[in-house]
């Protein structure tokens, strides 16, 4: 799922940059537990909020997505009309619609709010799927927009960021303290960054779990919008058109990994299909 990968990558980068800038400026988290928690919340939520605000721009730039302003082909006109019709059913402002060139069957939705969003599809998706299946994929992405998944993800990421920063500083303070009560600032900064990365990885498991639950919900939303058979057909098509991607890129695809994993942004295709059949 592109929006999750881009959000997490941007969030981590911003979090690291903020910490470095604050350290260079001499703004630290020394003080009582209350001030440390407040400092951690500012750092944690700033990163996730900036990631959210930049998500649409970063998504466009990263894949070279071309927004359809005026349809040039019948296919582009159909895409716009389909997204517009689905947005009306959700009572949403029509998202921007974009196409990007990639042989990989893929699609994603992103944006800072329910009424300022982007839905993009790859040329590979359009080439490999029928109109009914593409309609189901669009409905899945529209469900993410309608459910406000990006904003909810921002809040969750902000909370876990806060505890990542808070706990890493607590541990760094204990390790960097000398016998005479003084503290090595270099050791403090290094230890806090190491534990921030470690705790950040553990915190990502929480975000990934949340992402998998939202995928089930988006599948259900798509089924409600266009019917479960179309969504099941789209997922089965993804199973029949595997794409050889580096392991670190699996989270970028609409299907995610084919197996269940703690680090997967998506449930397995088989589990998603089974869940849809049980509706």
From Swiss-Prot:
GO BP terms in the entry: proteolysis
Cellular compartments annotated: Cell inner membrane
Molecular functions (GO terms): metalloendopeptidase activity; zinc ion binding
Annotated Zn(2+) binding sites: 140, 144, 215
Keywords: Cell inner membrane, Cell membrane, Hydrolase, Membrane, Metal-binding, Metalloprotease, Protease, Transmembrane, Transmembrane helix, Zinc
Active site: 141
Residue pairs linked by disulfide bridges in the UniProt entry: none
Pfam families cross-referenced by the UniProt entry: Peptidase_M48 (PF01435)
Lineage, broadest ranks: Bacteria, Pseudomonadati, Pseudomonadota, Betaproteobacteria, Neisseriales
Family annotation (NCBIfam families): PRK05457.1
Class of this enzyme: hydrolase
Name of the featured protein: Protease HtpX homolog
Cofactor(s) needed: Zn(2+)
EC number: 3.4.24.-
Cofactor, free-text remark: Binds 1 zinc ion per subunit.
Membrane topology (UniProt): Multi-pass membrane protein
Family: Belongs to the peptidase M48B family.
Major localization listed first in the record, in broad terms: membrane
Regions crossing the membrane: 4-24, 34-54, 155-175, 189-209
UniProt keyword Ribosomal protein, yes or no: no
Keyword presence, Secreted: no
GO (cellular component) term, any one: plasma membrane
């Amino acid at each position: 799922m592109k929006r999750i990968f881009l959000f997490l990558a941007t969030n981590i980068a911003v979090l690291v940059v903020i910490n470095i800038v604050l350290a260079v400026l001499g703004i630290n988290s020394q003080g009582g537990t209350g001030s440390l928690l407040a400092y951690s919340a500012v750092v944690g939520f700033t990163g996730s909020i900036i990631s959210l605000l930049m998500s649409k721009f970063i998504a466009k730039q990263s894949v070279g997505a071309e927004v359809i302003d005026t349809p040039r082909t019948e296919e582009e006109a159909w895409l716009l009309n389909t997204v517009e019709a689905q947005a009306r059913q959700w009572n949403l402002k029509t998202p921007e619609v974009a196409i990007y060139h990639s042989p990989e069957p893929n699609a994603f939705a992103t944006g800072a709010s329910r009424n300022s969003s982007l839905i993009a599809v790859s040329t590979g998706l359009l080439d490999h799927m029928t109109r009914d299946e593409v309609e189901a994929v669009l409905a899945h992405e529209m469900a993410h927009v309608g459910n406000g998944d990006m904003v909810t993800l921002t809040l969750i990421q902000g909370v876990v960021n806060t505890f990542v920063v808070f706990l890493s500083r607590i541990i760094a303070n204990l390790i960097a303290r000398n016998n005479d009560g003084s503290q090595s600032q270099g050791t403090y900064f290094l230890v806090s960054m190491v534990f921030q990365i470690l705790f950040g990885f553990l915190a990502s498991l929480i975000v990934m779990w949340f992402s998998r639950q939202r995928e089930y919900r988006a599948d259900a939303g798509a089924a409600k919008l266009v019917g479960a058979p179309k969504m099941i057909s789209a997922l089965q098509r993804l199973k029949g058109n595997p794409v050889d991607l580096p392991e670190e890129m699996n989270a970028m695809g609409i299907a995610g990994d084919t197996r269940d994993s703690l680090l997967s942004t998506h449930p397995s295709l088989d589990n998603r299909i089974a869940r849809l059949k049980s509706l």
